[in-house]
From Swiss-Prot:
The keyword Cytoplasm applies. The gene is hemE. Pathway: Porphyrin-containing compound metabolism; protoporphyrin-IX biosynthesis; coproporphyrinogen-III from 5-aminolevulinate: step 4/4. One of its GO terms (biological process) is protoporphyrinogen IX biosynthetic process. It comes from Prochlorococcus marinus (strain MIT 9312). Homodimer. This is Uroporphyrinogen decarboxylase. It is found in: Cytoplasm. Catalyzes the decarboxylation of four acetate groups of uroporphyrinogen-III to yield coproporphyrinogen-III. The lineage of its organism: Bacteria, Bacillati, Cyanobacteriota, Cyanophyceae, Synechococcales. Its EC number is 4.1.1.37.
């Protein structure tokens, strides 16, 4: 097995590679016509992400189109919630809606422990099929939402601009919030282990809303629970690389490095040279390219990729965007991103 590792997995493990691997967050999705056509036939997001045949088909769409070095499970960070007794729906124009927001002790105490093999068997099926069919031509990636971000959704009840409800809980009833975060950390750790057992070779933790916290509050409500998830995973799978992504992470990069993750995925608001100085050498870096550059012309895309890579040539690096690819991105520009990325050499 050691001789036949796919490129992204090799790079994530710190092995010598000839070029940086390339994939994109949200590489399966609305910018692709083939996805939009499928969405017309299956308008429910939950059906698309929870029906194993559909999730598999969507996960593979960018692989067939662009041959990225990573194939990521098509799912959602909220997908494990029903297995804990929290129902949700995703409305196309509004995003996620939690049917019964979690705001009391009795609600938190009544949450179920997540049993992924029972409530998320479809995820296992998809990852197993991806691993078999991708056949090490690319690395299969799994992912989860981090405890703080999941808590933000379930307390607020939906996406939020200022997170006043969860911050009110954090500063008025911190014990209540810690109880919820702890429940999520244990469940998400188990869910990641299930994904790895099912076929994920690298996993990514999305703490999308941790960038809304001050550094001192990150140390209380986000960092420790990210670390708890990583510790649970590493206890059983010490050699599976874990990536951590936070949107708006410039103020907490050093703190992210203390969570036990192997790779930090950067948004585009931080200078990558500066980030290299702030992140220990043994930790890899992913991303940093502004997804907005994909609305430019081909030359500007190539120049930005070259500029980013030249600043980080001496580090373990995975080429990616600093956020998910945006709806409306021209598919040919995504093609340019992948094609040019594969021409880079160490």
């Amino acid at each position: 097995m050691g001789e036949n590792l796919p490129l992204l997995l090799s790079a994530a493990l710190g092995k010598k590679v000839t070029r940086p691997p390339v994939w994109m967050m949200r590489q399966a999705g609305r910018y692709m016509k083939i996805y939009r056509d499928l969405r017309e036939r299956y308008p429910s997001f939950r059906e698309r992400s929870e029906n194993p045949e559909l999730s598999y088909e969507i996960s593979m769409q960018p692989f067939h189109a662009f041959k990225p070095d990573g194939v990521i499970l098509f799912s959602d960070i909220l997908t494990p919630l029903p297995g804990m007794g929290i129902n949700f729906e995703i409305i196309e124009s509004k995003g996620p809606i939690i049917e019964d927001p979690i705001r009391t002790l009795s609600q938190i105490e009544s949450l179920k422990e997540l049993n992924p093999s029972e409530s998320l068997s479809f995820v296992g099926q998809v990852l197993s099929s991806l691993k078999k069919d991708v056949n090490n031509e690319a690395t299969v990636l799994g992912f989860v939402g981090a405890p703080w971000t999941l808590a933000a959704y379930v307390v607020e009840g939906k996406s939020s601009k200022n997170y006043s409800l969860i911050k009110s809980m954090a500063f008025k009833e911190p014990d209540l919030l810690h109880k919820l975060l702890d429940h999520f950390a244990k469940s998400i750790g188990e869910y990641l282990k299930f994904q790895i057992k099912s076929g994920a070779q690298v996993v990514q933790i999305f703490d999308s809303w941790a960038g809304q916290l001050s550094p001192q509050d990150y140390d209380i409500f986000a960092g420790p629970y990210q670390k708890k998830v990583v510790d649970i995973v590493k206890e059983e799978y010490p050699d599976t690389p874990v990536i951590l992504y936070i949107s708006g992470s410039a103020g907490v990069i050093e703190r992210m490095a203390k969570t036990g993750v192997d790779i930090i995925s950067l948004d585009w608001t931080v200078d990558i040279e500066e980030a290299c100085k702030r992140i220990p050498d043994e930790i890899g870096i992913q991303g940093n390219v502004d997804p907005g550059i994909l609305f430019g012309n081909k030359e500007s895309i190539k120049e930005r990729i070259d500029d980013t890579f030249n600043k980080i040539k001496d580090r373990k690096y995975i080429l990616n965007l600093g956020h998910g690819i945006l709806p409306g991105t021209p598919e040919e520009n995504a093609q340019t991103f992948f094609e040019h990325g594969k021409k880079l050499t160490y």
